[in-house]
């Protein structure tokens, strides 16, 4: 189980890093690259946040039926589709509609990620919860470390491709974790 816990730490850290790259850069991408209004960035965050809670509840409902690993895989695929679609979207309406994928991604990560750690470490629930919480911090560190360098050298587009790559790493690691 220690190996599974370590792999899940990588999975969740990569998922949070991808999300944090998006959160750091999305407003600038919307304004500087797509030349859309700054109001849109706030609307996108608001819609995603409003949809995350129902997604967490839906994920909790399906958790016993399809398992945590499959739900996390659904989250990763949703995230990959979301970041790829954000790169291609050019209108405010499409950017807003895509937030459903973002909400699926984050709703499952927030709702199921911690439970997965706790199930892998049933004798250490507090440690499992802390470990999960630390994946968010590690994600911020990773995203913040590469963000400025990548934008300066390449572009905002490169960050979305990096986010997709991080989710690819998460997906590969997830496939080696026992489903509980």
Labelled PLM ranges:
Residues 1-12, 91:
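Juxtamembrane cytosolic amphipathic helices that cap and anchor the N-termini
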Residues 24-41:
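Short amphipathic helix-loop junctions that connect adjacent transmembrane helices
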Residues 55-67, 151-152:
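Helix-to-loop junctions at the C-terminal end of transmembrane segments
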Residues 108-121:
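Intracellular juxtamembrane helix-capping segments at the cytosolic ends
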Residues 123-153:
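A late C-terminal transmembrane helix in Major Facilitator Superfamily
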Residues 149-167:
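A membrane-interface helix-boundary motif in multi-pass transporters
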């Amino acid at each position: 189980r220690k190996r599974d816990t370590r792999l899940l730490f990588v999975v969740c850290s990569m998922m949070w890093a991808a999300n944090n790259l998006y959160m750091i850069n999305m407003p600038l991408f919307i304004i500087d690259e797509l030349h859309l209004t700054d109001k849109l960035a706030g609307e996108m965050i608001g819609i995603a946040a409003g949809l995350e809670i129902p997604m967490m509840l839906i994920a909790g409902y399906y958790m016993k039926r399809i398992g945590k690993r499959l739900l996390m895989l659904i989250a990763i695929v949703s995230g990959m589709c979301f970041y790829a679609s954000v790169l291609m979207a050019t209108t405010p309406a499409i950017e807003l509609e895509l937030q459903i994928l973002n909400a699926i991604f984050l709703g499952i990560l927030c709702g199921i990620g911690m439970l997965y750690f706790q199930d892998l470490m049933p004798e250490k629930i507090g440690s499992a919860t802390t470990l999960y919480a630390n994946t968010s911090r590690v994600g911020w560190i990773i995203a913040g470390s590469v963000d400025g360098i990548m934008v300066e050298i390449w572009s905002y587009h490169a960050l979305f491709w990096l986010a997709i790559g991080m989710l690819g790493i998460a997906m590969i690691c997830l496939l080696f974790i026992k489903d509980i």
